[in-house]
Structures are given as C-alpha cells and as structure tokens.
Amino acid sequence: MHHATPTHGTPATGENPQWWQDTQDIPTIVRAIYECISGPAGAPRDWARFRYLQHPDARSLRTVVDPDGSTHAVVFDVDSYIADVTPYFAATGFFEVEIDQRVERFGQVAHVWSRYEARESLETPVIKRGANSIQLCFEHGRWWVFSTVWDNEREGVAFDLW
C-alpha cells in the first residue's frame, strides 16, 4: 500500500481532494471510516478510500466471544480486514452509525472512543452496539488511523466510561 506524501498542508498531486479533506480533522476521519464500511447487502464498499485513511502499518483488532464464554482477539492488517468482512457485507446489509464520541489528544497523537450502533439497514432495529477505540497520529499534514480495536456490548459488558 503506497500513500503519496503531501506537502505544505495540501493534497499531493493526483490525490483525491475529498479523501484529503477526510484526514484534516478527527471527527471527519472517524465519520469517513463509518461511511466506508456501511452499506446495503452486496453493495461495494469504498475500500480505496478506507485504505487511504489507514496508515500503511495500521492494524485492527476484533474481540471474539467463544461459545464457552472465553474471549480472544483477531488481529488484521488493512487487507486482511477487508478480506474478512467482504463475504459478510456481500450477504448482509451493515450500517454502523456513531452515537457518541470522546477524543483525547496530546500533540500529534489522538485517541477516540467512538460508540456505535449497527443495523442491517437504516430503518431496521439495532442489531448490536459497541465501541471502537481508534488511535490516530498526525503526520505529513494529515491524520492517519494507526489502530482500531472494538468490542460489542453483551450481557455483562456495557459501555460505561462516561
């Protein structure tokens, strides 16, 4: 995965100006992530845009609850995440919508707690709620997603950090 390096706070030659705008502030990059992964069953996702938001070394971590109640983590790079979710998105509508956000920033580093609800369509009931823990770094005039870790609410696990 190659990313052009912009100069002087403007997109590099040939970069998509809208994608560049997605990376200029924290709420916008988070909204763009949700837009990239949401859509009706079978609809193509904007994986080129999704890749653009991610640092080349970005990782995602999904928590999994096994049938016996034990948990484990599944870690993905960008391409393995896309490969993992594509069959699900082909068969099932998935709309993840942010319902709350908390940003903590120090210098060029930011952490975002982003609470979400997921539905199969925008008109159907919520199928799950949870939280994304997103780590960002500002370099080369833009924000980059370095890691996203998430878990879903379930019996005994409710988001109560604020």
Task: Label the predicted regions.
Residues 1-52, 56:
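Short, low-complexity N-terminal intrinsically disordered segments enriched in polar/charged residues
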Residues 2, 129-159:
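Short beta-strand edge/turn micro-motifs at domain boundaries
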Residues 28-29, 33, 52-64, 80-87, ...:
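A short, hydrophobic secondary-structure junction motif
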Residues 37, 54, 116-118, 149-152:
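Short beta-strand segments enriched in hydrophobic/aromatic residues
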Residues 46, 61-63, 146:
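Short, hydrophobic secondary-structure boundary micro-motifs
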Residues 59-123:
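Surface-exposed, charged secondary-structure patches
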Residues 71-73, 122-126, 154-162:
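A short, polar/proline- and glycine-enriched secondary-structure boundary/capping micro-motif
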Residues 96-99, 127-133:
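Short, surface-exposed coil-to-beta transition loops
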